[in-house]
């Protein structure tokens, strides 16, 4: 497996999924603006954004005195590649099983 584990771990949390979906759908935002939109504190949002950043799911950019976060779905490519490979392996196994049962 590629290093998709941090992505899976980051997206396992519903708050982080909501943050990633928000940034993906509506574009960049600061932790302060996200705190006004979501029912959690700015400090909690900052911690969640740090996990998403470590997983490569968001990018940080200074915007004056604030840090702006934007979705960076590149890390999802590794996960997609891994899932496609695992899916193909299972399709092959199930095909062999189907042929064995039919024979």
Describe every region a protein language model picked out.
Residues 2-41, 63-77, 81:
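N-terminal helix-turn-helix DNA-binding core of bacterial DNA-binding proteins
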Residues 36, 47, 53-54:
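Alpha-helical residues within the helix-turn-helix
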Residues 44:
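Recognition helix of helix-turn-helix DNA-binding domains
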Residues 72-100:
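C-terminal structural segments of small proteins and small subunits
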Residues 103:
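Hydrophobic alpha-helical bundle segments that form small-molecule/ligand-binding pockets
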